[in-house]
């Protein structure tokens, strides 16, 4: 990818078809091998490269996985890392929505951006599941919320040179997907720290944004157990929402759920 970029700089773009790197049996699934196999570093490392040649995509379901693969193969001189669950997940995106997601890098999944009090932003298939569950609880308790999905975080970064600037989305497109001033909860497949840097354009402030992700907590756990251990379960997201909205968590969570996320109850009540 370094040589391919040099060729572009010289006006001789490479002709080789872009290469997909499929990352599956990943951090949130591979419980049998404990932390030795529970590591999202591959995607994080490639996000550190220039995004116009090093693409990192997080398909949300089978439809988006197919479209993401098609997008990679239609390009030239790039590596495309696809972080894909190996286990069945529900299809969230239809055909038209799938094409829009891959084209734009992100899309609204549920809710109304114009009237929501908080925006839940998921990066990763299992993270989207938890964000949707959190939204359901917020709506049930009278708080308008929306869920957005970021499939390709590199599209939303601050461009580091002119070539990358041609790849990232414009400010107008970004504001259309992520309205300024809206409190946001991010929940990501990766460790949160790399995404805080990549998504700096979406991070409004410490008081208006929270990031959840892989905290290096692992073990012989299933997906739900991994999400809980890393404080990425839907109830943890609700707790973040309560902090941003300035309301008591007890108005959004049952007592048993509060006890679970505080470490004093049965975690399975939020599985």
Place the predicted regions along the sequence by residue.
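Long, structured ligand/cofactor-binding scaffold of large enzymes
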Residues: 1-5
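Thiamine diphosphate
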Residues: 11-19, 24-44, 48-51, 55, ...
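Acidic carboxylate-rich catalytic motifs and surrounding loops in phosphoryl-/glycosyl-chemistry enzymes
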Residues: 57-63
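Hydrophobic alpha-helical positions that pack around
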Residues: 70
